[in-house]
């Protein structure tokens, strides 16, 4: 009989455990928070502030390129406006043909029409929560995905020109609509749009377009929330919301919208600032999405 040294036995046990159980990478809410800080520092990411938008665009692209070489910036023109959607792909290791899209808008609203101070009505929002938080979550997901390859392909998509709805008769989700038109070949198996997800009192009900057209995916996400014991999901119904998920739903795709509702009282005001954002809320929504990603080869 050959005697195995205790140190070697311990190492073998560790390796054996690693082989039988996969620990998903963890989402870092503090890192996500720092991405919001950076965006706010650039200034409003609205059509009225092209320099801030260019800085933010390059910041997103350069961060993504640290983690994948599959990054594209797609220019488009709609309603006389120019925009850019950013698309990063992380190929799956086991089932690359199965695709999961995670999306968020990266622009901010060019006015604060709900501000209590009438002098601010034409002032662009800072967009820390509405715009900044979704981008922050996607950028931290990109980092997390490099630690353990996803079993299925993940697409992170940053949509431009989402937040122009009801301004000069413009619709919401212009960039997402253009993305669907330009990439008609793209048919992800599932998709999640996240919006306004950093409030310290984050509460996400079941958005009604999502419930009507993608109920199973919505229930899958709520089940993960229960599994992780997060407190950001409500079993109550929300309302029908115009957001970046709708162009995908209209094209027959299985996409849901995770959004804080009722909207915070600083929504579309100059008070949508970094002090409204919470690292724990970012951690909770981020870890739910990460868990969803790593479960896809089992569903």
Place the predicted regions along the sequence by residue:
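Bacterial N-terminal signal peptides
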Residues: 7-16
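Solvent-exposed loop/turn segments at secondary-structure junctions
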Residues: 46-47, 77-80, 94-95, 106-110, ...
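Boundary at the C-terminal end of the N-terminal hydrophobic targeting segment
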Residues: 19-21
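Active-site-adjacent substrate-binding region
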Residues: 73-74, 190, 199-299
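Extracytoplasmic/secreted proteins, especially bacterial periplasmic and envelope-associated proteins
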Residues: 31-38, 55-66, 133-140, 174-178, ...
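A non-catalytic alpha/beta surface segment that caps or lines the substrate-entry region
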Residues: 34-95
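Positively charged n-region of N-terminal signal peptides that target proteins for export
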Residues: 1-7
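Acidic/histidine-rich catalytic neighborhood of metal-dependent amide-processing enzymes
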Residues: 122-216, 220, 232, 240-241, ...
